[in-house]
From Swiss-Prot:
UniProt cross-references to PANTHER family, sorted A to Z: 60S RIBOSOMAL PROTEIN L11-RELATED
Keywords: Ribonucleoprotein, Ribosomal protein, RNA-binding, rRNA-binding, tRNA-binding
Lineage: Bacteria, Pseudomonadati, Thermodesulfobacteriota, Desulfovibrionia, Desulfovibrionales
Pfam families the UniProt entry points to: Ribosomal_L5 (PF00281), Ribosomal_L5_C (PF00673)
Descriptive protein name: Large ribosomal subunit protein uL5
InterPro entries given in the database record: Ribosomal_uL5 (IPR002132), Ribosomal_uL5_bac-type (IPR020930), Ribosomal_uL5_C (IPR031309), Ribosomal_uL5_CS (IPR020929), Ribosomal_uL5_dom_sf (IPR022803), Ribosomal_uL5_N (IPR031310)
GO cellular component: ribonucleoprotein complex; ribosome
Gene Ontology MF, one: tRNA binding
Family matches, as NCBIfam families: PRK00010.1 (NF000585)
Family, per entry: Belongs to the universal ribosomal protein uL5 family.
Length: 179
C-alpha cells in the first residue's frame, strides 16, 4: 500500500464520512483512475516529436503510453483520419496512487510562481481536470535535457457525485488548491 493510499484510508475516509454523514465507509468517495494526455498538433507532420512525447509520458507515468489518432479528417489543419495527434495513459490502483503522491508533493511545488491549483477544473460530477504547461516539473524529467516543453492534461476521476465531495476529497489528500 502506498503512502497516499494509507493517508486516504486512515485520515481522509473518517473526515469525509463525518462531513457528509455517510453510514458506511464504502459510501465515501474514492479515486478511480488518473488519465494523462498530451496533445501534439504538430506531431502529424513531425514523427520525432511524437516518439519523444511517448517516451517522456511513459517515464512520467511509469506505464506505457499509447498514441491517439485523429478520428476525422480536417483539411484546414492538414489532418487526415488516422494520423497521430497525441498520446495518453490511464493509471489505476498502485501506479495511480504513486503518481498522485508525486504530483501533489513534488511536481506542483516546482511550478514557477505557484500559488495553488485553481478549483474551476471540476466537471459537476466530482471529477477534476488540471492543465500543466510544462512537463519538466516532474522529477523524472531533467529540465536541461528537455528539448520541446510539452503541456499535458491530468484528469482525476472520482466516485464523488458532487464537486463539493470531490474537492474535499482532493483537499484532504493534500492537493494545493488556491485560497
Amino acid at each position: 500500500m502506498t503512502r497516499l493510499e494509507n493517508i486516504y484510508r486512515e485520515k481522509v475516509v473518517p473526515v469525509l464520512q463525518k462531513e457528509f454523514n455517510y453510514d458506511s465507509s464504502m459510501q465515501v468517495p474514492g479515486i478511480v483512475k488518473v488519465s494523462l494526455n498530451i496533445g501534439l498538433g504538430a506531431a502529424s507532420q513531425n514523427n520525432k516529436l511524437m516518439e519523444e512525447a511517448l517516451k517522456e509520458l511513459t517515464v512520467i507515468a511509469g506505464q506505457k503510453a499509447v498514441v491517439t489518432r485523429a478520428k476525422k479528417s480536417i483539411a484546414s489543419f492538414k489532418l487526415r483520419e488516422g494520423m497521430p495527434i497525441g498520446c495518453r495513459v490511464t493509471l489505476r490502483k498502485e501506479r495511480m496512487w504513486d503518481f498522485l503522491d508525486k504530483l501533489i508533493n513534488f511536481a506542483l511545488p516546482r511550478v514557477r510562481d505557484f500559488r495553488g491549483v485553481p478549483d474551476r477544473g471540476f466537471d459537476g460530477r466530482g471529477n477534476f481536470t488540471l492543465g500543466i504547461k510544462e512537463h519538466a516539473i516532474f522529477p523524472e524529467m531533467e529540465a536541461d535535457r528537455v528539448e520541446n516543453p510539452k503541456g499535458m492534461n491530468i484528469t482525476i476521476v472520482t466516485t464523488a457525485t458532487t464537486d463539493k465531495e470531490g474537492k474535499l476529497l482532493l483537499d484532504q489528500l493534500g492537493m494545493p488548491f488556491r485560497k
